[in-house]
Amino acid sequence: MAQVFNFSSGPAMLPAEVLKLAQQELCDWHGLGTSVMEISHRGKEFIQVAEEAEQDFRDLLNIPSNYKVLFCHGGGRGQFAGVPLNLLGDKTTADYVDAGYWAASAIKEAKKYCAPQIIDAKITVDGKRAVKPMREWQLSDNAAYLHYCPNETIDGIAIDETPDFGPEVVVTADFSSTILSAPLDVSRYGVIYAGAQKNIGPAGLTLVIVREDLLGKAHESCPSILDYTVLNDNDSMFNTPPTFAWYLSGLVFKWLKAQGGVAAMHKINQQKAELLYGVIDNSDFYRNDVAQANRSRMNVPFQLADNTLDKVFLEESFAAGLHALKGHRVVGGMRASIYNAMPIEGVKALTDFMIDFERRHG
């Protein structure tokens, strides 16, 4: 079968080694004669899977001991509600940074539970979209927490700064599309959450990292399935968890460790992004509308100078084994999502195709 590279923004490409191992183990996991999908989440066999996955995740991010790791349902949108329901306490407002589509979605959900103070961080630099530096974010005095999205998958915008607002500010962040792609100082955050379907594993699992002093503050109306304290007290098994997604994510964590960990992946991700942006920037045929300082290394949107060629580009790229390059309906054009599992060979195949397509159609 011809090589296919999947540039989907999520569910996204998984490492080939992980898929092959899962295939080998699918019907007879560890000699039990059953699939890991079939065994009880409370049995000792799956408990070992769960514990190893958490420890490997902790190792990869150097998560401090005073942080809890929760394996949850609900995706990022579930946490749009989970964050205010767990962290507001007796306060009625929180600071929300708006820098793109997903940040705005979090704000919309938060309005059901509080009166968010919106920090509009969107700016234009030399005609390109950018984000205000953190030093220009005007935080309010009475906010229960600060929320932002470090990587906007649709807009292709990244906020790479590490927050440093002092110990009194509880920083929360949606790391769904950038978790494990670069070193992360977990100690600068109160809550980090990430849907698994981009850089961790298959859809259906959500990871939450929460500082333990923030537990026990959930609103009385918070659904139990979103209550961090309930989930922590039940080892993320308050109800039946998405066991197969948990298992596969654990395999991805082991794969990441074998690649050299997050620091090694960060270098590879930089190389992939530089290769793709280099082709875009050295061409009048392709265009990216994000300022260099805020360009995402995970999601690279680009436009063709002649958008009547979009359909042809997508058809020919798909035939060449380069799948899921259509941009989000909000922005159009193309988008290449190049998460950890995308090898540099995949990006090279894309850039070679782009150069050839320009030669033939430019």
UniProtKB/Swiss-Prot annotation:
High-level lineage: Bacteria, Pseudomonadati, Pseudomonadota, Gammaproteobacteria, Enterobacterales
Annotated compartments: Cytoplasm
Pathway: Amino-acid biosynthesis; L-serine biosynthesis; L-serine from 3-phospho-D-glycerate: step 2/3; Cofactor biosynthesis; pyridoxine 5'-phosphate biosynthesis; pyridoxine 5'-phosphate from D-erythrose 4-phosphate: step 3/5
Matching Pfam families: Aminotran_5
Record protein name field: Phosphoserine aminotransferase
Cofactor(s) annotated in UniProt: pyridoxal 5'-phosphate
Family membership noted in the UniProt record: Belongs to the class-V pyridoxal-phosphate-dependent aminotransferase family. SerC subfamily.
GO CC entries: cytoplasm
Main location: cytoplasm
Catalysed reactions listed for this entry: O-phospho-L-serine + 2-oxoglutarate = 3-phosphooxypyruvate + L-glutamate; 4-(phosphooxy)-L-threonine + 2-oxoglutarate = (R)-3-hydroxy-2-oxo-4-phosphooxybutanoate + L-glutamate
Keywords: Amino-acid biosynthesis, Aminotransferase, Cytoplasm, Pyridoxal phosphate, Pyridoxine biosynthesis, Serine biosynthesis, Transferase
Residues the record lists as binding L-glutamate: S9, R42
Function: Catalyzes the reversible conversion of 3-phosphohydroxypyruvate to phosphoserine and of 3-hydroxy-2-oxo-4-phosphonooxybutanoate to phosphohydroxythreonine.
Main enzyme class: transferase
